[in-house]
Each structure stands twice: as C-alpha cells, then as structure tokens.
C-alpha cells in the first residue's frame, strides 16, 4: 500500500471552498509546549492563516508531556474526538520506547494502528510524524535509544499500512546528526527535545509538505530555521 500524499488531504479542498477547518496536534511533550516561544505547530497555523486568512480554522494543541500510545487511547474521546478534527497530526513514540513503560514494539504497533483507525472513524485525515532523530548517544538508558529506533520504524510501517501521510523527521534529521553532530546539536535542547530553532525547522518542513510558506515579513523572523532547513536539504541532495 502506498502512503497518502499531503496533496490528497481533504483540508485543501475545504479551504479552496472557504470552509472552516479544524486541525489537532496529538502527542506528548514534543507536541505540547516544552519551552517558551513559538512552537512547530504555531508555524503550521501561521502558514495556513497567511494563505487562507485568520478565520480559516482552529488549530488545537492536544499534546501532554510524558504520554504514550496507551495515554492517547485513554484520552482519545475527551481530548481528540471532542474537537471533530478534519486533520490530526500525531507524533508519538518517545515515551513508549522508555523501558520503564513496559510497552513492547508489538504493543506500540497495535496501539498506533488502533489510534489511526479511531481517527479515521471520525472522518479525519492523519499525518503521522516520526521524532526528530533524537541524540541517541546521550539517551539513558541505552535500551531506550535502541527502542526509539525500532519504534520510529514502526511509525513508518503503520503510516504505509494505514495509508496516512508521513512526515519522516527522524530520517531527515538523522542525516545531519550522523554527518555533523555539532551542527545537529545546535537544534536540540536536550537529547529528546528540540530548541527554538528546531521547532522552527519542523514547522517550516511541515508547511513545505502542505505546499505553504510563511509571508515574507514572517520569514524574516525565522532566519535560524530557514538556514537549518537549507543545511538539511543539502544532505538530501
């Protein structure tokens, strides 16, 4: 099965007809605000509103730090289905890979698949995201780092099996991390979380996949993220 393309998302047709959209970001600490300043989901919201106007839709952040797929299933009805989304951007797995959580790769796959099917039952499209290639050398315990690699591959496989869109941050960021660790670490707050520039980069990359850009006066505020994006593009050339 081939993964869904971003151009196929129903929100594009809705926006062209001037219909109101609702987009929900669902996940853990990398979805919830982890530090002050603009967050990757803010850049997504700004990009849509720059193109389609400030009243084009609601952009709801439903991330909770420390969550696993078990937690997302538990709070699904109240904190996702409640919003009746047209699109869900789901980023999960960084806590499932913690050995203390006792979530096996098989359970992670099953839970993620169930989440996708529940979201589809709402009539919503899905963008699955992998994490941003965490700093595996600095993750403790080492077993968590190994599990992280496994779980991110599962995200890719579920995206294909469930025909969702995929934003594969992990694969993109890994090229920089594995080639230039010093530059990669300029985008990280710690081994598991991005800093301001990392947030900019994720948001700008997502906007590009949606076929959108920020207004020129907004782009002037995003020079670090744009430079990081250009650097990563060179590793994909």
Positions of predicted regions on the chain:
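Cell-envelope and extracellular/periplasmic
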Residues: 62-67, 91-102
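Active-site segments of SGNH/GDSL-like serine hydrolases
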Residues: 91, 95, 116-152
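Charged, glycine-enriched surface loops/patches
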Residues: 105-129, 154-164
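A short acidic, helix-capping loop that chelates divalent metal ions and anchors anionic groups
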Residues: 32-34, 70, 96-101, 135-140
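Serine-esterase "nucleophile elbow" of acetyl-processing enzymes
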Residues: 1-65, 70, 75-84
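Structural recognition of the beta-strand scaffold that forms the well-ordered cores
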Residues: 23-25, 58-61, 87-91, 126-130, ...
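Glycine-rich anion/phosphate-binding loops
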Residues: 67-74, 102-112
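Catalytic His-Asp segment of secreted/periplasmic serine-dependent ester chemistry enzymes
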Residues: 133-237
């Amino acid at each position: 099965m081939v993964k869904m393309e971003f151009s196929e998302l129903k929100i594009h047709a809705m926006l062209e007809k001037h219909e109101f959209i609702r987009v929900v970001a669902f996940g853990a600490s990398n979805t919830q605000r982890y530090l002050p300043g603009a967050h990757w989901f803010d850049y997504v919201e700004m990009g849509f509103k720059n193109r389609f106007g400030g009243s084009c839709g609601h952009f709801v952040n439903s991330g909770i730090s420390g969550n696993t797929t078990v937690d997302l299933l538990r709070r699904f009805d109240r904190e996702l289905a409640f919003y009746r989304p047209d699109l869900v951007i789901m980023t999960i797995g960084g806590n499932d890979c913690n050995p203390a959580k006792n979530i096996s790769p098989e359970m992670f796959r099953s839970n993620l698949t169930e989440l996708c099917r529940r979201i589809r039952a709402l009539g919503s499209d899905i963008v699955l995201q992998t994490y941003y290639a965490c700093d595996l050398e600095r993750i403790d315990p080492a077993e968590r780092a190994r599990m992280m690699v496994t779980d991110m591959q599962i995200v890719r496989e579920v995206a294909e099996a469930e025909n969702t869109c995929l934003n594969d941050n992990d694969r993109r960021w890994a090229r920089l991390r594995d080639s230039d660790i010093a530059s990669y670490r300029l985008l990280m707050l710690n081994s598991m979380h991005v800093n301001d520039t990392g947030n900019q980069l994720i948001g700008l990359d997502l906007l590009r996949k949606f076929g959108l850009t920020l207004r020129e006066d907004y782009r002037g505020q995003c020079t670090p993220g744009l430079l990081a994006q250009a650097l990563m593009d060179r590793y994909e050339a």
